[in-house]
């Protein structure tokens, strides 16, 4: 084979070797970053390291006293989490249902004395970072898709039948003991037809067998809610 034919083959071999080395190095850097982050989160003297992947079910009620154009609701929620061993960061899938406790209305008029039901699916990620031995910061970002069910007055579009929005939660978490944590934070982003809840306060208690109990209280302008959640590790 002549030198003119050998040259393209040699260049191709060098290019393949270079790409392989670059891929290996990029993969190594990525693995090193994740390994270092996980090592830092798991070895720090941060309480509640026993959190593990779990299924969480919750029930709550919302009281809306903004006026006769708004309704109270009962809420049911289920969440499946996939977290790191330290429980500090991970991903989740969320399913929810909210039903009005009396005839639904809107700011523009009644919805023909019909209860309103909201079914939702969503998913997101959360992160918890240590700041001090007993203090940490948390953040959560999720995207939700809702389907509304109600009787619509003929020719009038008061509420959407479907809606999608993103929501963020962030705040500070105080670790009172190895099993108890208190949190205070803000809620941003949600559908206009939902109660305008802005602040969130919670108490989390770790039970035996990688289970947990959470009580949440949320507030907004003339709106308040409470929620109890039970998580079971697997």
Positions of the model-derived regions?
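Transmembrane beta-strand segments that form the barrel wall of outer-membrane beta-barrel proteins
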Residues: 27, 53-63, 91-95, 137-144, ...
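Short glycine/proline- and aromatic-enriched beta-strand/turn motifs that initiate or cap beta-hairpins
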Residues: 20-90, 96-101
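Transmembrane beta-barrel architecture of outer-membrane proteins
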Residues: 71-77, 118-122, 165-169, 196-198, ...
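Bacterial N-terminal signal peptides that target proteins for export
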Residues: 1-8
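Outer-membrane beta-barrel "beta-signal"
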Residues: 199-201, 222-234
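Flexible, solvent-exposed loop segments that connect beta-strands
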Residues: 61-69, 99-118, 147-164
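Outer-membrane beta-barrel channels and translocator barrels
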Residues: 48-51, 83-89, 128-134, 144, ...
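Detector for outer-membrane/organellar transmembrane beta-barrel domains
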Residues: 118-189
């Amino acid at each position: 084979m002549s030198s003119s034919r050998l040259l393209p083959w040699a260049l191709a071999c060098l290019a393949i070797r270079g790409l392989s080395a670059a891929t290996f190095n990029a993969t190594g850097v990525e693995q090193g970053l994740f390994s270092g982050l996980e090592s830092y989160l798991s070895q720090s003297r941060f309480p509640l390291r026993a959190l593990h992947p779990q299924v969480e079910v919750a029930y709550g009620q919302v009281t809306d006293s903004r006026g006769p154009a708004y309704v109270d609701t009962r809420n049911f929620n289920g969440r499946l989490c996939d977290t790191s061993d330290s429980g500090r960061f991970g991903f989740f899938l969320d399913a929810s249902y909210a039903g009005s406790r009396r005839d639904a209305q809107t700011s523009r008029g009644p919805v023909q004395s019909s209860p309103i039901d909201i079914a939702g699916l969503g998913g997101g990620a959360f992160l918890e970072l240590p700041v001090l031995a007993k203090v940490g910061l948390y953040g959560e970002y999720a995207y939700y898709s809702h389907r509304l069910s109600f009787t619509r007055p003929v020719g009038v579009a008061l509420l959407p039948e479907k809606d999608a929005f993103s929501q963020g939660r962030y705040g500070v978490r105080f670790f009172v003991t190895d099993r108890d944590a208190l949190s205070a934070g803000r809620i941003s982003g949600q559908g206009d037809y939902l109660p305008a809840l802005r602040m969130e306060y919670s108490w989390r208690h770790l039970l035996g067998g990688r289970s947990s109990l959470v009580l949440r209280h949320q507030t907004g302008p003339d709106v308040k809610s409470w929620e109890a959640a039970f998580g079971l590790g697997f």
